[in-house]
């Protein structure tokens, strides 16, 4: 055990030690150590997770005869239920795509898709700032990969040109809204690049965009009218949609390849039908949350201006607002100060973000008021 203790001590010395907090949730507030704080770190972007009216409407439709609380098996064995197919058909129909496939989480999706769709003769080109789950999926793919500079499409084009004809297929991998900086990929440029090179596919993770952007809440791809041009459009139900699980929209051939070759799908017990039914209930109503999306954008624009005024650094264009302080100690101290003021703010440190860019990742939700955000900004 000595070697493990030394590792933990080293993390502590670098201000990188992590622990799981004891929390009590009360709507948009969190209580920790008897201190009630406004939650400024949630991914519940539309504020649906604590909406009691939604929850009541969902439960009432069953009259006590609820869907099963467990699937007890992989979908490929005995764990498939009609609600799974219903949700996949609804997702595909809303995106106006041929197929959709469900996964247990966004991590499961990103871990398994690339290994299932690549060979040792394939190439993956990923944005430098893609999520850790995508990096893990790339590593498991056992094929060549390069990471292009963040949102640097000239660099990506150079990599594509250098590798023309060398690989059986190429995947360009990006997030649409990046989880730490809150900035947005230029999907139009990525689609144009993809079309210039043979056997090249575009894989976009919309985890932080689904529900929040687009006329119907379908993400940045919908906002930019590019849904049909993206080969794999992945998103999660665990953030703005207040549920659990994830999806990919794609063509039928890719769906069948994933069903046959994606290990996290094949070898995992499927999500409980009860949870999938709740996801269906929320996803069906996604176009109705336009007021929440509009209000969230107003809150976000205000806080982005306030933080930029103080730091002169603001990469974000979304409701993820990074308050970049640089060093670990300063970031930890600021987070503790804001918590004492009644705001649950969390420090983000390396290796989650690059060295020297430690920050407080501020995350706004549509159930906050402008007065609450103004009062918070005054504490910065």
Curated annotation (Swiss-Prot):
SUPFAM superfamilies associated with the record: PLP-dependent transferases
Q: Does the keyword Transferase apply?
A: yes
Keyword Membrane among record annotations: no
| Binding, substrate | 18, 131, 352
Question: Which reaction equations make up its catalytic activity?
Answer: 6-carboxyhexanoyl-[ACP] + L-alanine + H(+) = (8S)-8-amino-7-oxononanoate + holo-[ACP] + CO2
* EC numbers, comma separated: 2.3.1.47
One annotated GO molecular function: pyridoxal phosphate binding
| Functional pathway | Cofactor biosynthesis; biotin biosynthesis
Q: Which Pfam families match?
A: Aminotran_1_2
Main EC class the enzyme belongs to: transferase
Report the cofactors: pyridoxal 5'-phosphate
Q: Locate the N6-(pyridoxal phosphate)lysine modifications and list their residues.
A: 239
This protein's UniProt keywords: Biotin biosynthesis, Pyridoxal phosphate, Transferase
Q: Where does pyridoxal 5'-phosphate bind?
A: 106-107, 179, 205-208, 236-239
Annotated GO biological processes are: biotin biosynthetic process
List the PANTHER family: 8-AMINO-7-OXONONANOATE SYNTHASE, CLASS II AMINOTRANSFERASE/8-AMINO-7-OXONONANOATE SYNTHASE
Which protein family is named in the record?
Belongs to the class-II pyridoxal-phosphate-dependent aminotransferase family. BioF subfamily.
Q: What does the subunit section of this Swiss-Prot or TrEMBL entry state?
A: Homodimer.
User: What this chain does, per the record?
Assistant: Catalyzes the decarboxylative condensation of pimeloyl-[acyl-carrier protein] and L-alanine to produce 8-amino-7-oxononanoate (AON), [acyl-carrier protein], and carbon dioxide.
Q: Please give the name of this protein.
A: Putative 8-amino-7-oxononanoate synthase
């Amino acid at each position: 055990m000595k070697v493990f203790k030394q590792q933990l001590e080293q993390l502590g010395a670098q201000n990188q030690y992590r622990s799981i907090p004891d929390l009590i949730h009360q709507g948009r507030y969190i209580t920790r150590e008897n201190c009630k704080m406004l939650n400024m770190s949630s991914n519940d972007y539309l504020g649906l997770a604590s909406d009691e009216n939604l929850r009541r409407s969902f439960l009432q439709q069953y009259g006590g005869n609820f869907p099963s609380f467990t699937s007890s098996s992989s979908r490929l064995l005995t764990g498939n239920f009609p609600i799974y197919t219903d949700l996949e058909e609804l997702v595909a129909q809303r995106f106006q795509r041929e197929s959709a496939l469900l996964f247990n989480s966004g991590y499961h999706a990103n871990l398994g898709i690339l290994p299932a769709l690549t060979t040792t003769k394939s190439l993956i080109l990923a944005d430098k700032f893609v999520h850790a789950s995508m990096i893990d999926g790339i590593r498991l793919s056992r094929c060549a990969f390069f990471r292009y500079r963040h949102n640097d499409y000239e660099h990506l084009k150079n990599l594509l040109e250098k590798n023309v004809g060398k690989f059986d297929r190429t995947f360009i991998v990006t997030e649409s809204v990046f989880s730490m900086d809150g900035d947005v990929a230029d999907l139009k440029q990525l689609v144009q690049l993809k079309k210039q090179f043979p056997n090249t596919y575009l894989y976009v993770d919309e985890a932080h965009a689904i529900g929040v952007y687009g006329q119907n809440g379908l993400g940045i791809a919908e906002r930019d009218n590019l849904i049909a041009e993206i080969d794999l459009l992945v998103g999660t139900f665990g953030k703005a949609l207040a549920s659990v699980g994830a999806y990919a929209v794609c063509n039928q051939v890719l769906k069948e390849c994933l069903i046959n070759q994606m290990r996290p799908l094949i070898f995992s017990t499927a999500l409980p039908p009860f949870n999938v039914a709740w996801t269906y209930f929320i996803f069906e109503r996604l176009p109705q949350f336009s007021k929440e999306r509009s209000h969230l954008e107003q809150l976000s624009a205000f806080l982005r201006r306030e933080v930029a005024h103080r730091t002169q650094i603001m990469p974000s264009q979304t409701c993820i607002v990074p308050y970049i302080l640089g060093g670990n100690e300063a970031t930890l101290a600021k987070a503790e100060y804001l918590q004492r003021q009644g705001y649950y703010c969390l420090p983000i440190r390396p290796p989650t973000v690059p060295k020297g860019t430690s920050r407080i990742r501020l995350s706004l939700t549509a159930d906050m008021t402008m007065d609450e955000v103004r009062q918070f900004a005054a504490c910065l």
